[in-house]
């Protein structure tokens, strides 16, 4: 495993040293654009909470607390009871009906596929994975390997040391997993490892000749009416299985409702009752005081309850005793089950809570709940600018590099009044700045690493005020991301990252810092993801700017992951040589990584004679 960890250290070192470009893993664009025009199929019936036995006041209080907590960053919330949607809220600027990255929540879907394979008699729980993939490991090595079964993968007890960090080390993830060392006796100790799920996906492909996505489309996604989804593959074409799935919140709810209905949907048995029974049973204890683990899903606090769980707040919580499903998408700063968001939800649905069959309708409470959801969906000061049906399509303006606007480097006296947005916009319009340090990307590091889509580095930034609209343009490699900026409410746009288009919503604010320096604050939300990019642009004298970058959630988790790797590598010769070549200690590495996550870079005004082409029209 040291080789893979060194690859991570090498990637981190390249970031610190300002080296842009790829990793050891081949990149190819694969993410499709969100299918705006696709018709949504099999939507749930909507009902009032009271008609299904729960008070509107309960949901209103829950949503307020989730929104107010400094430890939560809510994106989508949905609640079902008896198969009907009784509460749904989309927190600005995340729109209703948009797919969202699910992270590890999709592991539970991979588990469903394994159950289907077993039902079709194409696989057995006790099969040795080395027998399934005989061509990926040499016969001599196999002699000294313990038996690792399909069930060990399902319960996260394989003990294989090749884990998530290894995916940056090369293209052959399956071969690396099968040839990696094993800690302990398989089946005895819970060690969460997303590559276990990846290998389950590879097993589906091995036994069927189809990718996991191809296998599930007619068996699961199609019957459920799930059409707006995308699941990433590895460089070898195997569906990632344990991460990389984009899915809409209501479709996540369908997957929970399917298990409430014992695997049956519209009269068709999609997942066997036997599989649901054994997969939702606790097979072993887990760390961090969670409630146990089944087959690719987690036990929850209420007796008999369980959840499909993904980091940063992607959850489908199933309460069989209440015939209820809850769905969350979020960008929290915490990883798994032991988090503030889930604790807040548990507070409102404790073990001793039992909803009624039906409650009297309460028009006032329901009206207040709907108003609250509207306020959260609009954000403070109505924080939405364009409709889902057309806003991003109109604002997709990433394009190949060229200059087509009149150049101006005048800053008027209006800069002295930054609260006057339009005066400030006019003052900076037409100005282009060349960045001194050109290794920062528009995408957060989380997006870059998870999708193996590394930045080419922002070289220029420019500002345009046109017909009452304000734009900030970032030149990154050969692409210009021209982002409309909303003030008071976010404006919808799109960025082109090496052929993959990511929808964003950009919110701006003009202010002054404690030294009376004008500042443009930008919050760039990647609305299909869990993360936001933040930039504070300081307009100094002498035609100079400084940009202080940040991302959320970010530094805490990135540094925690780095710490676990550097601790394991502290005595490794190659690792120490790698750092020694650059006179970097482990302590300095962490300090430099902090600066890489939250860099401050300067830019200098680009004069007319430096501009590629100048439009001189007045």
Regions found by a protein language model. Give the residues of each.
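A small/polar active-site loop signature that marks catalytic segments
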Residues: 158-233
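Active-site Gly/Thr loop motif
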Residues: 276-328
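Active-site-proximal alpha-helical segments within enzyme catalytic domains
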Residues: 196-203, 241-264, 314-331
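N-terminal leader/targeting segments and the immediately adjacent pre-domain N-terminus
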Residues: 1-95, 118-123, 363-438, 445, ...
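Active-site-proximal binding-pocket segments
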Residues: 216-217, 221-280
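Active-site SXXK
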Residues: 83, 101-126, 153, 200-204, ...
């Amino acid at each position: 495993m040291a080789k893979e960890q060194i690859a991570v250290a090498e990637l981190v070192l390249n970031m610190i040293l300002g080296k842009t470009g790829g990793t050891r893993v081949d990149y190819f664009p694969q993410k499709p654009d969100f299918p705006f025009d696709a018709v949504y199929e099999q939507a749930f019936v909507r009902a009032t909470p009271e008609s299904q036995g729960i008070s509107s006041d309960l949901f209103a209080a829950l949503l307020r607390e989730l929104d107010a907590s400094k430890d939560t960053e809510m994106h989508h919330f949905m609640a079902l009871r008896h198969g009907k949607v009784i509460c749904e809220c989309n927190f600005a600027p995340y729109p209703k009906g948009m797919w969202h990255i699910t992270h590890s929540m999709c592991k539970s879907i991979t588990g469903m596929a394994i159950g289907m394979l077993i039902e079709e008699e194409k696989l057995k729980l006790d099969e040795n994975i080395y027998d399934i993939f005989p061509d990926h490991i040499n016969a001599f090595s196999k002699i000294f390997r313990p038996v690792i079964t399909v069930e060990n993968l399902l319960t996260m007890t394989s003990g294989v040391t090749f884990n998530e960090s290894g995916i940056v080390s090369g293209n052959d993830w399956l071969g690396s997993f099968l040839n990696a060392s094993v800690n302990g006796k398989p089946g005895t100790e819970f060690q969460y490892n997303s590559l276990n799920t990846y290998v389950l996906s590879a097993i589906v492909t091995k036994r069927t000749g189809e990718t996991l996505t191809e296998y599930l489309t007619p068996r699961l996604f199609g019957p459920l009416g799930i059409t707006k989804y995308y699941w990433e593959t590895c460089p070898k074409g195997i569906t990632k299985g344990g991460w990389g799935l984009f899915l809409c919140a209501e479709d996540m709810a369908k997957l929970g409702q399917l298990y409430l209905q014992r695997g049956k949907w519209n009269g068709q048995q999609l997942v066997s009752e036997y599989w649901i029974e054994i997969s939702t049973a606790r097979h072993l204890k887990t760390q961090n005081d969670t409630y146990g683990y089944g087959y690719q899903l987690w036990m929850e606090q209420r007796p008999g309850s369980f959840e499909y769980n993904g980091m940063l707040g992607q959850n489908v919580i199933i309460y069989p005793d209440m015939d209820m499903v809850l769905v969350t998408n979020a960008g929290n700063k915490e990883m798994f089950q032991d988090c503030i968001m889930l604790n807040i939800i548990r507070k409102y649905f404790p073990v001793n809570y039992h909803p009624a069959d039906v409650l009297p309708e309460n028009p006032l409470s329901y009206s207040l709940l709907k108003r609250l959801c509207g306020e959260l969906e609009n954000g403070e000061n109505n924080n939405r600018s364009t409709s889902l049906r057309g806003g991003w399509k109109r604002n997709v303006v990433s394009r190949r590099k060229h200059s087509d606007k009149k150049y101006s480097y005048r800053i008027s006296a209006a800069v002295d009044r930054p609260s006057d947005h339009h005066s400030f916009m006019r003052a900076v319009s037409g100005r282009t700045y060349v960045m001194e340090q050109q290794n920062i990307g528009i995408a957060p590091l989380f997006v870059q690493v998870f999708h193996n889509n590394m930045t080419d580095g922002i070289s220029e930034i420019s500002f345009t005020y046109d017909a009452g609209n304000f734009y900030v343009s970032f030149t990154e490699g050969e692409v210009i991301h021209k982002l409309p900026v909303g003030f008071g409410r976010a404006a919808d746009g799109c960025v082109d990252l090496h052929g993959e288009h990511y929808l964003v919503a950009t919110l701006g604010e003009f202010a002054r810092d404690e030294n009376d320096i004008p500042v443009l604050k930008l919050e760039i939300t990647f609305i299909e993801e869990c993360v936001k990019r933040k930039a504070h642009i300081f307009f100094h004298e002498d035609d100079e700017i400084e940009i202080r970058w940040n991302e959320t959630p970010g530094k805490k988790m990135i540094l925690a992951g780095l710490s676990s790797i550097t601790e394991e590598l502290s005595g490794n010769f190659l690792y120490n040589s790698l750092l020694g070549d650059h006179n970097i200690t482990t302590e300095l590495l962490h300090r430099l990584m902090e600066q890489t996550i939250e860099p401050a870079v300067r830019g200098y005004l680009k004069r007319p004679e430096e501009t590629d082409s100048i439009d001189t029209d007045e």
